[in-house]
A protein has these predicted regions:
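Short, small-residue-biased leader/transition segments that mark boundaries at the very start
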Residues: 1-6
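Short glycine-/acidic-enriched loop or helix-start segments at secondary-structure transitions
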Residues: 8-11, 36-37, 98-99, 126-127
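Buried hydrophobic packing segments
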Residues: 10, 77, 95-103
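C-terminal intrinsically disordered extensions
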Residues: 12-17, 101-104, 117
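Active-site/ligand-binding loops adjacent to catalytic centers
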Residues: 14-90, 107, 129-157
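Short beta-strand segments
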Residues: 26-28, 115-119
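Nucleotide donor/acceptor-binding cores
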Residues: 111-113
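Short, mixed-charge aromatic SLiMs
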Residues: 118-129
């Protein structure tokens, strides 16, 4: 769609005007064709990844694509809500996790700017990513344990 055109044009424009200093890093679920065409499998992060290359995909734009597991994306999504007060969805958690992973792997320091686009809201995920029972039933019990804080009543009563 039109959004894809803007993304491609913006990415190429920023690369051009920065003389190559700007890098475009894609975030994609482990199991998507973009991450590894030889290892396509099911994943639970919604609204991202594909099992085919759409016509709008411009492989020359991303400098790197960072793979993110469902557990990594969901944990970051829940942490963003708990620690930062940001109610975002799984693809946003995936984007933030991939930015942090990229920054660590490439030894970025405080003088380097990283911009993360968070493409979704968490409103649609109240019965999934933000539901402890759903998370446990889908194999993410360890994520629930790491991201669940005691209630105020449990802490003070």
């Amino acid at each position: 769609g039109l959004g894809d055109v803007y993304k491609r044009q913006t990415g190429h424009y920023l690369k051009d005007v920065s003389n190559g200093a700007v890098q475009v890093i894609g975030a994609d679920p482990e199991g998507s064709i973009y991450s590894d065409p030889n290892d396509v499998h099911q994943y639970q992060i919604e609204g991202v990844g594909e099992d085919f290359y759409p016509k709008a995909f411009d492989r020359s734009l991303p400098d790197e694509i960072v793979q993110v597991t469902d557990a990594e994306a969901f944990e970051m999504t829940r942490r963003l809500a708990n620690e930062e007060g940001l109610l975002v969805g799984g693809s946003s958690g995936m984007a933030v996790f991939s930015a942090l992973k990229y920054a660590r792997e490439h030894d970025l320091d405080e003088n380097q700017l990283v911009v993360v686009l968070m493409p979704d809201s968490g409103r649609s995920y109240m019965e999934k990513i933000f539901n402890d029972d759903w998370m446990r039933a889908n194999g993410f019990a360890d994520v629930v344990e790491r991201t669940t804080k005691p209630s105020l009543a449990e802490q003070y009563l």
